[in-house]
A protein has these predicted regions:
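Structure-specific DNA junction-binding interface
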Residues: 1-73, 77, 190-198, 202
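Amphipathic alpha-helical segments within well-ordered protein domains
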Residues: 72-76, 87, 107-111, 161-165, ...
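Small-residue helix-packing motif on alpha-helices
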Residues: 86, 98, 121, 174-177, ...
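Amphipathic, charged-and-aliphatic alpha-helical interface segments
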Residues: 51, 58-59, 83-102, 123-128
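Strongly charged, low-complexity linkers/loops
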Residues: 129-179
Length: 202
């Protein structure tokens, strides 16, 4: 119903925002990361929104960027994951880290979110792994990797390097770690996992 709402930020706390637009105040539930990034009360803001409608509940959820909204929509598509759990995930980890956790079966990262136990984390990975493709991961990271335009091997290497960079490693560290473990028969998940093991060694 609403793609986004642009207006004046009237109020914010750890759970929701109130944005006034054309004389109407919208209560928008959101993540801690959006609360931190949205700006000061009184300023103009743009919030990407999702209207959640159930028989006993109509609520508006929103985020400061499209990437958070995309992950929110993916999460609530998972059986047993509602909006509150999705908000909890987005409050704990960034969209790029979420995407990386899913494609690398990183249950530990997902369970950092309050209310997300091991079983739910496993279900998230199972149901979303095929939906989070290489292009989406690289887009979330914000690094150009020429996925889909380069050869298959170059694509896997570029994507693995990009994934390590989002975890805080420098381009040089990421490139060295990937080069040390890469073989042609590896898929992207195996490359990343093996590279991380190498980086973890003293």
């Amino acid at each position: 119903m609403f793609a986004y709402i642009r207006g004046r930020l009237d109020y914010k706390n750890n759970d929701f925002l109130i944005v006034e637009s054309n004389g109407v105040g919208y209560r928008i539930f959101t993540s801690l990361s959006t609360i931190a990034d949205i700006g000061e009360v009184g300023g103009e803001v743009k919030v990407y929104t999702y209207l959640y409608v159930r028989e006993d509940n109509i609520s508006l959820y929103g985020f400061v960027n499209q990437e958070e909204l995309n992950v929110f929509e993916l999460l609530i598509s998972v059986s047993g994951v509602g909006p509150k759990a999705a908000i909890s995930v987005l409050s704990a980890i960034s969209p790029s880290r979420f995407s990386l956790a899913v494609i690398t079966d990183d249950i530990k990262t997902l369970t950092k979110a309050q209310g997300i136990g091991k079983k739910i984390a496993q279900r998230i990975i199972l149901e979303l792994k095929d939906k989070i493709n290489k292009e989406q991961l690289t887009s979330n990271i914000g690094i150009e990797a020429d996925i889909g335009t380069s050869g298959g091997d170059d694509s896997k290497v570029s994507e693995a390097i990009s994934a390590l960079m989002v975890l805080g490693y420098t381009p040089a560290e990421a490139n060295k770690a990937v080069s040390a473990v890469y073989t042609e028969d590896m898929d992207i998940e195996t490359i990343i996992k093996n590279a991380l093991k190498g980086l973890a060694r003293p």
